[in-house]
Amino acid sequence: MNTKPIYCLAAIAVVSLVATLTGCHTPASRSASVTPCMNVLDRFTAANVPEMGPDETFAPAGKWTNGVTPPNLPGKGLAQHPMLIVGENYDKIFLVDHGKVIWTYSTGTSYEYDDVWMLSNGNILFSRMEYAAEITPDKKVVWRYDCHKAPGINHTEIHTCQPIGLDKVMIVLNGLPPRLKIINIKTGAVEVDHELPFSEPPNPNGIHGQFRRTRLTAQGTYLVPVFGLGYVVEYDKNFNEIWRYYIKSPWAAVRLKNGNTLITDEADNLTREVNPKGETVWEFNTKKDLPAEYQFTSAPQTATRLANGDTIFTSRGEHGKGPQLIEVTPDKRVVWVLQDWKDFNGITAVQVLDDPGIPEIPVQSEH
């Protein structure tokens, strides 16, 4: 059965909804493509793409380049998926296609990458704790938002970003107080600027653990993992609380197309899918459910749900040991293990580029 027409109708409906919510539109030529990111990959290998862009900063080789890759791992290695990946412990963005790294972007020795997106126009949006930025395939910076880096009462951090259409970006600033912002990157206007509740005594040294992967949903609500206090909260567009779910250390919370929420709990090595009633419909504990030979050496921080129902877990790894990415089926069968410490370091975020969806439309990319 050909499901593309059905999918495209759903995509058009969501485009209309998000356009209403955000005041921006995705061009029809791109919205008509089920996998728009695949259509722009040639821009990353074009003749005008420099080896080092004017705003790139050299990143030294990873610490664990001598890590050994075990033989006979499930799946196709780097050829399993075309993908965009970043990791907390390394200083490059990697773009992979047909089993090869086809493009990188170096940001020098700095603090952690936590979020990354390829948009349908080929631009890359990422967060680097001290800032968030959007760059073009030929490595030009089109937008950047810098945090207050100096320690003290004004110190801020960014651990999450999300494109809202092609003209707007949502970020969460950990700080005193923490704030959620939606910024029009074309005009510079801050269109949403709201203080997020965080019920701990103000502590400039404690902002790092406040919030992680926050997402705007297709309904215009905000799904916020309160990492430091152990719950996920959902706010309506006016920031009234409409849903809460308690879990030990929620690093990421992603609203799925089926209406459920996929939550990654770093402390308990757990990824859990819950329905709107808070009932568990699926969960995977990497300590208990992974075979011994594929055990992560560092708990997953994020999970990506694919259109085929599979789930990909990321791991920062430890000292060049253990896998960085693992894909499992709904019945918990391992179908892919990536363990490559020669080309990569730990991995915190992955976007699979041939999965259906327009990334800048909320919920279409379930990562």
Feature map (PLM): residue ranges:
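Bacterial lipoprotein signal-peptidase II cleavage site
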Residues: 25-31
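C-terminal motif of bacterial Sec signal peptides marking the signal peptidase cleavage site
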Residues: 20-23
